[in-house]
Amino acid sequence: MALANPCLDFCLGIFGTGLWSVLDNLCVLKRGKPPVAWLATEKIFMTLKSVRPKKFLGQHFLKDQNVAKAIADTVDACPDIPVLEVGPGMGVLTQYLLPKKRETKVVEIDFESVAYLREEYPQLEENIIEDDFLKMHLEHTFGGRPFVLTGNYPYNISSQIFFKMLDYRELIPCCTGMIQKEVAERLAAKPGCKAYGILSVLVQLWYDVEYLFTVEPGVFNPPPKVKSAVIRMTRNEATSCGCDERLLRRVVKTTFNQRRKMMRGSLKPLFAQLDQEQGRTAGGHADFLAQPLLTKRPEQLSVQDFIDLTNAVEQEMKG
């Protein structure tokens, strides 16, 4: 295949395909964006009609059309609002979102994927956002309008994506897509399950979670070492969590970070922090820590139990 840049053609003649590894290493420095000196070669990648998955970006490109269509169909549960796809890669999912005739934007950090999408999906030109999703101000994405979040999410940031979703929950009534099976199980887990943890409680506080189906590694390039799963999360009717949400997050994270301890043991460090923040002498919470609920471990508490516990901790600190 003839290349569009004679300088790069010459370099390839000397270094062979190893040059691509050099380019990859350079791109690591810019989180998926090329150094300025290589910007002029962007069109070269467009001529290759392919994008090589990058491990440092957690890319595993979906190649099964049936799975892609099934994921695209999950957004139908929340009709009549725009769609934002995270990490479209080569557009395997995108191609099934576009015919739905809904305003669709994609956010992609990898410059090579962006170049490919511009070439293969010219109708997306104005709706390709070249950015890091985790750093975006989502209120500007659709002018403050609610939207569906979807994607074949990069495995290395999937949990971070859902924590960001929680921060923008008023704008995201529905979130669907594919993630590691382990993360999907954590999202959908109920009290008493080994998978039940921080993500389970904080997400289920605001969303109803559905584990839709499991996906085998062979439908990806490259195949991941783990199975994947498709999930759908739909905002529940809660308008308030019923407690101080910041304190709730601290209670949940503190206790699950010591999940093998009973609640009374895992809460002691939190009370020490709260006492210090309020300028109080540490200790003095023995009666509170003696209540029966705190003989349980965190995975035994429901979302409502954590809400009630947070309110009780707040009252204890006011006493």
What label would you give each PLM region?
Residues 31, 37-254, 299, 308-311, ...:
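Catalytic cores of RNA-modifying enzymes
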Residues 6, 24, 32-37:
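Intrinsic disorder/low-complexity segments
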Residues 13-18, 32:
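Residue-identity detector for glycine
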Residues 235, 254-319:
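C-terminal lobe and adjacent flexible extensions of AdoMet/dcAdoMet transferase-like proteins
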Residues 2-4, 17, 37-41:
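Ala/Thr-enriched low-complexity intrinsically disordered regions
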